[in-house]
């Protein structure tokens, strides 16, 4: 292809803009509405009505509903019909209204989501009640008497074998393991649980029962008393597993021919399932010892549903009475807790048995202080306060079950009964744990009186106040009593000598203080905490509680001016001396500030405090810090910077950014945000001055440009630098800082060779080519308004950019360089126009500097010819079969550029355009729809004045089918 002489097409942007605007036409709405049902009228009258009228006024008209979906409906929503059908299921005639009422009542009494399940308490008990003492356990080893009889055995032999199995339940081969550590003990219990499942899976039901009995016997043993609550949790897990296996087994026997409904009755159960169920209960009845018999039967409580209607209720009453025969009060209270747990799962509506368990507990409460217990504690060297805490999980659970949705009258009665007991601190503690927070809060003063009457030696009063504080953090006491409640509580808390006990209690009451009082009271509480936790660096062992204190304060105090004016708040933060904890606390403070600070601030108290907090976060960054953590910290610091505003005091704002740059130099996203902030500051200054800068504001925007120019090179990300150089150059131009803008743009061009061929994005290597092309296109669009430097040559920035593109090492088999050349042609064509498409106010671009000087136009044309020559040479080199697609795409791109920006009245340029069209369609790989639309556009353009040459060209452009 021969070289051509370039001529830019003359553009009249205003007239083109007007011609391309959409036509505005008035819309007559009348009675029309797009959602209104359409009625087609067949009118016999021929009077001049509008075509397609929706009027239905004709006397002899027939309405037709053309919407096929509407015609299928009779006016009723089909989804509503389905919903109505599902809400009113067909009921069998045998179900009476009374039965429905009973079931509805039971459903209302079912345990809801507001009931804290046992599973949530399990982990806390296991972690709290530990021991270093050695433990022992009896492992079941199996027995030879449980061999399966042959099919030919007589019935009498089966009976005899069954009796032998029952006798062997407690006398099977056992192995006692001594001197086990706590972890070994837990592992052995887990082995038993696994053995139970394996025995059941292999149809060795009797062996499974023996394992459960042996495990249940362990609950009679209190030789290592501190571990008993954890032992209870582990053993009852096995009991729960066993109960579930037996229930599922009997349920499956009822599935023939139809599975049982969820709300089945004993009448729905077949005889085989009932017989199997009875057989299990007969086996359990043969267990000689009370404790294992009680626990195993409780585990199978749900199976009573298969036998009789009232079986569960009767069994609960009987087992409740049986517990009275257990002599050890600790064993008895946990047996009651298990019975209440199973009862709440199986029949939560049977409240009487729950209440009976509680009142029986009260009746036997004095046993705790009896001689036998005291002797046992002396033998095991356990103090009374420690011993009493062993009861807490069981009593708390019993009271939680009893108090759940209980009427106020019952709760009041239970509280009165607790008052009548001597040494009732343990019960009082559980009452405050388990009763509704609203109930406790309204009687807070009464509870404080009861706490005062308790014996300090038996149960520490600070634990009682801690339990009271938990309730008061969820519900509010009467307003008139709040101050006296806080004073009474803090009198006790501040006297606690153990730092651990003190902070555990103080942390709870901080929420009550923040919830109901001002910063004065909160400051006093913080001062007291600092006083108690500073000696011997006790705070180092209480970081979780101290963090909780901070979070509670931040929950209720969102006025940071008030918060940082607290005398003791920052000294309190100084107690967090472990780096990781300190950073977490700082992050929580910043998160609350960003979330709740509504207006930008210039308060020096807030700024100094938050700057210190952000610096703490920033200084935690090191070479090992993960990228996600860096992003998280940068996000919080940027949120702080965004909320700092000095109003019209722009110089103070810039000074803050200078200080922030020095403080946060290790976090690149923060530096980038600061550059954006300063650029925004310069633009805001220009907006205030309405583009007419005074000497002072002109100096200020130059200072902003200097800030950005100095800061950008410190960034490591090459594309961040490129984009910020370009953006800062645009800001400088907008504020008439021409030399600064020139420096920014030259700096951007100078670092183009540093762009790597691939970059890491989210841990993956990706080609940088597409990002570089995007940047260059943005850069080219800016160059239209940048005036040439008087000491440099014509179009020196454009030439510099193109030279860098020429020398850049592009990827192999890449067309990126040629695409940049094609992208530069519209810029050069726009520069040759008499008036530019866009300009910057008060900045003289090249249209003013050169005023259409023929030498300037000649330089542009010469550069365009060079670029087109480079593109054509590249197209010639793409001759191989595998390159024709790239060749066609580039040819079509250059054709579009010539069509839009070249003067096609020039015959050579016109012929080049036709050749490019033919080349792009030569192999039939060009998008047909795009080609058709392009031809239509050319034909439309040909209809305009001085565009007749398009008609001749259209005749020479043909569409070729795909090969």
From Swiss-Prot:
Q: What is its main location?
A: other
What are the annotated GO cellular component locations? Answer: endosome
Q: Where does the record say this protein resides? A: Endosome
Membrane-crossing residue ranges in chain numbering: none
Which keywords does UniProt give here?
Endosome, Protein transport, Transport
Q: Which domain of life is it from?
A: Eukaryota
Where does this protein have compositionally biased stretches of type Low complexity? 52-63
Record region (Disordered): 38-71, 85-111
On whether Transport is a keyword of this UniProt record, the answer is yes
One BP term from GO: endocytic recycling
Instruction: Quote the subunit structure annotation.
Output: Component of the heterotrimeric retriever complex.
Q: According to its UniProt record, which protein family does this protein belong to?
A: Belongs to the VPS35L family.
Q: What does this protein do?
A: Acts as a component of the retriever complex. The retriever complex is a heterotrimeric complex related to retromer cargo-selective complex (CSC) and essential for retromer-independent retrieval and recycling of numerous cargos such as integrins. The recruitment of the retriever complex to the endosomal membrane involves CCC and WASH complexes.
The protein in question is named: VPS35 endosomal protein-sorting factor-like
Q: Which organism is it from?
A: Danio rerio
Top-level taxonomy: Eukaryota, Metazoa, Chordata, Craniata, Vertebrata
Give the encoding gene's name. Answer: vps35l
